[in-house]
């Protein structure tokens, strides 16, 4: 008898599941209300009302006082004229005949659910392990685990999940954007940074101080960094290869992302410097003394608009140390602003970085121009070479060009190391045995326990 019922019962279950999915799919979740929804009648029409005891059909309605403890005698008829669809759940734990788990999806609004998108629900899931979201997407949950979506943990399940979890895009460009949005974010973050930074230098230099002063340059770079951080929040707003490198070392940022981040940052700087050049081309021609005259190192040279050049009295050691100190300050302050265990800055981090950059420029910018960023210096320098400034962009300052490419990496590493050693108590290689050196020496010192019997 039981075996004979199994095949019709399975067909009935599939039909019921299809009808349930259809009914749910017709709702433009979560705004539209369901005028009436008769669960028992729907099950009975699918020929397996007898197979499921009414006592096993549990209706749990959350966040609504009038349905907090519904009576089983009134379970067959109720109206949702006041109730949002996402506020109720129902479940059928098990089938009494074949003792198999119910394939009907269980809707759950538990707050600590790990979300992993899947097109097919697992057939061997127990109660509260299979979920159905607003897009009829079956999702598998693991009770107690963190909530994960496209950007990792942290879904607030008080918000309808359809607003938090985006399904895989169908359009070609949407798929490209979905995959490349972090590099795009870094590109435009640096683009905004250089657009404001080189723009303010161009205005001050080409107007011979009539439309700004040195402090204007500090303000412009600070604003550029602040707005660049706002524009590139999706990717973490590094906008500096040295910052990305330090995060790979101290904050477990994936090394596989470092090359594409660095490339996007350099390209963003190149494109922005090209826009600044196009905008000020007429003023550059007038300042240089004629059309297409481009010089480096003279009083009427405009090359300093795009990249940094050291003061004539600076030695090679002084050049390097100046960039090293400024980069160390930058990285130390970035980690301080991000550390919630310290005072932290939260959503005011971009504003805090504005003051950091303004302070570095106002106090440490005269000698070398405080590049503190490979992308900020190398990208515009390369663009200026292509625009006709010649090989002098590389040889000026006793071949200074390599200093703002190397010193920021060493300075940012040292700044991050200083903060983690003396202040930071969170997850960092510094806060592991041998300050992280043990990880770099598999089988080396301290990696194996010494047998006391030997």
UniProtKB/Swiss-Prot annotation:
Residues 1-186, 238-257, 338-351, 425-454 are cytoplasmic. GO terms for molecular function: glycerol channel activity; water channel activity. CDD domains: MIP. Residues 208-216, 279-316, 373-403 are extracellular. Induction: Expression is higher in vegetative hyphae than in conidia and infection structures. Disruption phenotype: Leads 28% reduction in the vegetative growth rate but does not affect conidiation. Also leads to significantly reduced lesion development on tomato leaves. The chain crosses the membrane at residues 187-207, 217-237, 258-278, 317-337, 352-372, 404-424. Keywords: Glycoprotein, Membrane, Repeat, Transmembrane, Transmembrane helix, Transport. It catalyses: H2O(in) = H2O(out); glycerol(in) = glycerol(out). It is a multi-pass membrane protein. A motif (NPA 2) lies at residues 373-375. It comes from the Eukaryota. GO terms for cellular component: plasma membrane. Signal peptide: none annotated. It is found in: Membrane. Aquaporins contain two tandem repeats each containing three membrane-spanning domains and a pore-forming loop with the signature motif Asn-Pro-Ala (NPA). AQP9 has NPA/NLA motifs which is in accordance with the fungal aquaporins (NPx and NxA). Belongs to the MIP/aquaporin (TC 1.A.8) family. This is Aquaglyceroporin-9. It comes from Botryotinia fuckeliana (strain B05.10). The gene is AQP9.
